Amino acid sequence: MRIVKLTEDTKKDILTNLLKRSPDNYGSYEETVKNIVNDIHSRRDTALFEYTEKFDHAKINADNVRVTEAEIEEAYTQVDAKLLETIRKAIVNIRTYHEKQKQWFDSENNGTLLGQKVTPLAKVGVYVPGGKAAYPSSVLMNVIPAKVAGVGKIVMTTPCNAEGKVYPTTLVAAKEAGVDEVYKAGGAQAIAALAYGTES
């Protein structure tokens, strides 16, 4: 991590450099992502597996793309008991917060009905980054609101390493939060697979 000290003397240069990261510089990335999304849409699993090998250096296929219960059980053996306790406490806290956002109705003295209606989707896809570090908080902050809302099925994708392994803390957080299926895929190709579906 680069630490930058913002002072009156350095402020102008720092802000100028930050503003250089404008959307104008993202054209080539956008084109790359569009090509990946279109390729997943047309070639589905074949494209997903090719991109996973290209970007994550992992050879996945229809037989190993989905995380198994055995892999989840193994992940539990690799997560410290104190961390597991922290994950469980975070789940309670996040659930408590989001339950306050559930639907409610009230009526005014003049008969006006006010409120919020929450209609959950039947199934959602959740993407959790994981190329260089584990992000169990991303699992919890995406999955728990969906569970509180009443989503019926939650499918998650997250990158695996070259050996086809997913970070243990990510898998444990997914299991504890109630994810139904976890797939080993990252990046734009994983998000496109969630959106369009593939054979696996």
Q: Which ranges hold each PLM region?
A:
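Short, structured coil segments at secondary-structure junctions
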Residues: 150, 177-178
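Conserved NAD(P)+-binding/catalytic subdomain of aldehyde/semialdehyde dehydrogenases
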Residues: 178-200
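Positions that flank functional sites
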Residues: 55, 161-162, 189
